[in-house]
C-alpha cells in the first residue's frame, strides 16, 4: 500500500489506507448518513460497511448526495467495502447477498467484498443472540468459489476475508483461483498479529485492521488500548493523542485501518497520522505491550456447532 492520508491509494486495487467504520448497535440511518457526509468533507474516501451492520443504505444515500453537491466528482472517487454475513455463507446465497448489498447501496459494484467470518449459519439468521442450532459447517471452498464469481461478474472489484487465522488463510490460498486481496482482522497495540502479518506479507495479502483503538464502548470491546500507560506516555511526549499514536503504529505496519468516529473533530484527528513517525525506541516499547485478543467471538462457539471452543475457531492462534 502506498503512503498518504485517507485518499492514498493502494498499489494493487486502490484501497485508501484509512477507512471509516460504520458498525453501530441498532439501526441509525440518519446519523450514519450525516456522519458519512462529514467524513467525505474531512477527506475520507474509504467506507467500511456490512450486511450485518445495516448501514449500507445510508452510506449509499450519502455517496449520492456527495456527488450531487459536488463534494466528490463521482462514485468512483469512493472505495466501498462490504461483507457477506454468516447466514449467506452458502454457495447459492453469496451472489444474491451481494446483489442485495448493491441494491441497498444503490451502486453497481463494491470495491471490496469480504467474507465476514469463517462461519456459516442457517439462512435468515441475521440477528443475535444466536442459538446452538443456528450454526452449520462452513464450506470454505464453496463459499470462495461463489465469491470468485462475484469478482468475475464485476460486482466486486476485489474480494477477501475477515477474521481468518493463519491456518484458515493457508487453506484458502491452497485452492483459491483468485487469491484474497485482503484479510480484515483485529489489529491494535495489544493484539499485534505478528505471525499473521508475516504470513500475509509473504503471500501478498493486505491486512486491514479493525478495532485499532480497542473498540471501547462496544459490547465486546475493551479500554485496554486507550488506557495503556505505554501509549499514554508516548502520546504525551509527542504532543499527540493516544488514538493518533495507535493509528500511526498500525499505519507504520503497512496495514490499512478502519477507525470509527461520528464526531467531526475526531474524524479529522484520526486522519492526522502522516507527516510524523514513531521513533525506534517508541516502536520497541509498543512491541513489549502484553498481548491479548479483544474480539474473541465467543458467540460463534457452541457445543453443538462446528467450533466447540475458541481454539477451534482461531486454530489455537489466540
Curated annotation (Swiss-Prot):
Active site positions, chain numbering: 53 (proton donor)
What does UniProt report on the pH dependence of this protein? Optimum pH is 8-9.
Citing just one GO molecular function, the answer is: aldose reductase (NADPH) activity
Record's keyword annotation contains Repressor: no
Could you tell me which Gene3D superfamilies the record lists for this protein? Answer: NADP-dependent oxidoreductase domain
Positions that bind NADP(+): 48, 162-163, 184, 262-270, 277-285
Per UniProt, where does substrate bind?
116
Its Gene Ontology biological processes? Answer: cellular response to zinc ion starvation; response to iron ion starvation; siderophore biosynthetic process
* EC number(s) recorded for this UniProt protein: 1.1.1.285
Group of enzyme by EC: oxidoreductase
What switches on its expression?
Up-regulated under iron-deficient conditions in root and shoot tissues. Slightly induced in shoots by zinc deficiency.
Q: Does the keyword Transmembrane helix apply?
A: no
> Which keywords are on file for this protein?
Iron, NADP, Oxidoreductase
Q: In which pathway does it act?
A: Siderophore biosynthesis
Alphabetized CDD domains for the sequence? AKR_AKR4A_4B
Pfam hit, one: Aldo_ket_red
Q: What does this protein do?
A: Catalyzes the reduction of a 3''-keto intermediate during the biosynthesis of 2'-deoxymugineic acid (DMA) from L-Met. Involved in the formation of phytosiderophores (MAs) belonging to the mugineic acid family and required to acquire iron.
Protein name, per record: Deoxymugineic acid synthase 1
Amino acid at each position: 500500500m502506498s503512503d498518504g492520508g485517507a485518499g492514498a491509494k493502494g498499489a494493487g486495487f486502490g484501497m485508501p489506507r484509512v477507512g471509516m467504520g460504520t458498525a453501530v448497535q441498532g439501526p441509525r440511518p440518519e446519523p450514519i448518513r450525516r456522519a458519512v457526509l462529514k467524513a467525505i468533507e474531512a477527506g475520507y474516501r474509504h467506507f467500511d460497511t456490512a450486511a450485518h451492520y445495516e448501514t449500507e443504505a445510508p452510506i449509499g444515500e450519502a455517496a449520492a448526495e456527495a456527488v450531487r453537491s459536488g463534494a466528490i466528482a463521482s462514485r468512483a472517487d469512493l472505495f466501498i467495502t462490504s461483507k457477506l454475513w454468516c447466514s449467506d455463507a452458502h454457495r447459492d446465497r453469496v451472489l444474491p447477498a451481494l446483489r442485495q448489498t448493491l441494491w441497498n447501496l444503490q451502486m453497481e459494484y463494491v470495491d471490496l467484498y469480504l467474507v465476514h467470518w469463517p462461519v456459516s449459519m442457517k439462512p435468515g439468521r441475521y440477528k443475535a443472540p444466536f442459538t446452538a442450532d443456528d450454526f452449520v459447517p462452513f464450506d470454505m471452498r464453496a463459499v470462495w468459489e461463489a465469491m470468485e464469481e462475484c469478482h468475475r461478474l464485476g460486482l466486486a472489484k476485489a474480494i477477501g476475508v475477515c477474521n481468518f487465522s493463519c491456518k484458515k488463510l493457508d487453506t484458502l490460498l491452497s485452492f483459491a483461483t483468485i487469491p484474497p486481496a485482503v484479510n480484515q482482522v483485529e489489529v491494535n497495540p495489544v493484539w499485534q498479529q505478528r505471525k499473521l502479518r508475516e504470513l500475509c506479507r509473504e503471500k501478498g495479502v493486505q491486512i486491514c485492521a479493525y478495532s485499532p483503538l480497542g473498540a471501547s464502548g462496544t459490547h465486546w470491546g475493551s479500554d485496554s488500548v486507550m488506557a495503556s500507560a505505554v501509549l499514554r506516555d508516548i502520546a504525551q511526549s509527542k504532543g499527540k493523542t493516544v488514538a493518533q499514536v495507535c493509528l500511526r503504529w498500525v499505519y507504520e505496519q503497512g496495514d490499512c485501518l478502519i477507525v470509527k468516529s461520528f464526531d467531526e473533530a475526531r474524524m479529522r484527528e484520526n486522519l492526522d497520522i502522516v507527516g510524523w513517525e514513531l521513533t525506534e525506541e517508541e516502536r520497541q516499547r509498543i512491541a513489549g505491550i502484553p498481548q491479548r485478543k479483544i474480539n474473541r467471538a465467543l458467540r460463534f462457539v457452541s457445543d453443538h456447532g462446528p467450533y466447540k471452543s475458541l481454539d477451534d475457531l482461531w486454530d489455537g492462534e489466540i
